[in-house]
Amino acid sequence: MTKWIVPACYLALAIAPAAAADVRLDSYRNPKNENFRIFNHMYLDGVRGGMMAYNAWLTHHGGQPSFCMPGNLALTTEQTEEIMLKSADKRGAKGDMLVASLLLWGMQDTFPCEKPASQ
């Protein structure tokens, strides 16, 4: 029985941080204090960076990118936030909606890719 306790504890500890890794729209719009507001901006920057890196990886490996941002454009945190919040408004998003999903949809709305001629 004791051989299962350590793996169970490890699993519980490994899963716990993953549940807290998402930021929801309500907590983004209404941070508890200035530190949470700063954290939200850092989180949004990280999500944007991850999406851009994944998009570049997809393109490099012959896949269809999720959005087609101009190559010479560098988005600021404020611009990224505006894209995400417009996406939330467009979709009538509720407070429990994930900020990352809203940003992805907003990037697709703001920087659509041209469809291939065959479609």
Named regions from a protein language model:
Residues 82-118:
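Short, compact, well-ordered microdomains
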